[in-house]
Amino acid sequence: RLKIKGLDSNMLSCLPNLETLTCFNLKDGTHLGIKTPNLRSIDIYRSPKILNLNFLLDLKELRSIGLDGLSNVEEMPDLSNLHSLTGMSLANMKRLQSFPLYHENLKNLLLQLPFDVLDNIIPENLPNLKHISVNLGSDKKNGMVLDRFKGICEVGIW
C-alpha cells in the first residue's frame, strides 16, 4: 500500500508487488502499468495535470478505481478489457464529456458527474451491477439516471 502526493510515475522504481496506490496531485500516470503490474486498487485525487486516463488500460489487475478532482479529463477510456474491475467511483470531473461504460463485471458504481454524462449510463451495459449511487447535487435530472436502475440493483443517493 502506498499513499503519495505529487507523484510522477516516471520517477517510480518498479514496484511489482504494490497492490494499492493512493495519489494526490498525480502528474503523469503513463508508466504505472509497467512499474506496478499487480496493482489492484488505484485512487487518484485532485490531479489537474492528468489530461487522459489511457494509462488505466495497462493496469490489467485492477479491481477498483477511484477518481476525484481530475478536472481536465474530457473522456474516459473504454475499460471493458479490465476483467477484474468490480468497483468504480468518479467525482468532480467537471470537463468529462465521454464515458463509454459497458462492463460485465462491474458491481459497484459511485458517481458525481454532469447529467449529460450520467444520461448515457444504462442498466443493459452493466449486467452484474449490484449497487449504484449518484450524487444528485443541484441538478434534479440526475435522479432520472437512478430511476433506470430501480428494481435491477440497489440504488443510493449521496
What name fits each language-model region?
Residues 1-13, 17-51, 55-74, 78-158:
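Concave beta-strand-loop units of leucine-rich repeat
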